[in-house]
Amino acid sequence: MAREEEELGLVVIGAGLGRTGTNSLKIALELLYKKPCYHLKEIYLHQHSHIAKWMELDKKLTESPDKKIDKALCHKIFKGYIAAIDHPACAYYKELLELYPKSKVVLTIRDPEIWLAGCRSTILPRDIDQPRTWSFQFLRKCIGLSQFHELFLINCRRVFGEQMDFSNDTSMLNGFVQWNQNVIQSVPSDRLLKFDISQGWEPLCKFLQLPIPDCPFPHVNEYNELRRLLKLEQRILKLSKWLLPTLILFIFAYIFYKFVL
């Protein structure tokens, strides 16, 4: 089994967007396969070096005349992982499905209104793509969030389109519904599972042809974890508002002390 999975690469690809139960699915897949599952949280918790790899992957795909995903980069990113779900991988499910022809796709689904409410309070605030002051950008870069935010925004634009108005709830809801429909239409039915995590183990294990584990299906709420990240950004924003006036005051004080006194 282990040797076969190593040769196959990714066995499961998640096409469901963030806040659809992907964190619970990650843990479920890790319980089933006894190997790690790639997820957005892997990047900001463990794999910071992957940010540059994902940006390079997206750039190469955009510029590729045949729209093929870079095989070598994918193998570097997913080395040691049995599955890849959530952002940023979900945005490339079509390309990954072609790269790993024996893989299967799990589309985690959720009520659109509930999904949007969850996004607004965590990963997709209305001002996610709005310009920030240089002081805010500087502070965010100092703590390592600048590139992570840039990658996530690039990923969201690949999902929803370059013209998406992230501040508009109706546009976001339509984008979410359209994304799910595109997945359903483009993935062969025998390789696709539409999965609500409230369904538990049975449909997932049946689809993957694996025995049901002797433990409850994991139901993890990543709300608190994501809120901590958002609150950190909010603190940076507040601090950045004081940075420029403080810097100007310091410069004037220095000039006054140096040349006037």
Label each PLM-derived region with a short phrase.
Residues 1-72:
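PAPS-dependent sulfotransferase catalytic core
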Residues 14-16, 40-41, 85-89, 109-110, ...:
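Short His-Asn-centered micro-motif
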Residues 22, 90-94, 116, 201-204:
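Short, well-ordered alpha-helical microsegments
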Residues 34, 42, 63-78, 88-91, 94-194, 210:
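PAPS-dependent sulfotransferase catalytic domain
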Residues 46-50, 106-116, 178-237:
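The conserved 3'-phosphoadenosine-5'-phosphosulfate
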Residues 75-100, 107-108:
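Glycine-rich phosphate-binding loop used to anchor ATP phosphates in small-molecule kinases
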Residues 235-261:
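Terminal signal-anchor or tail-anchor transmembrane helices
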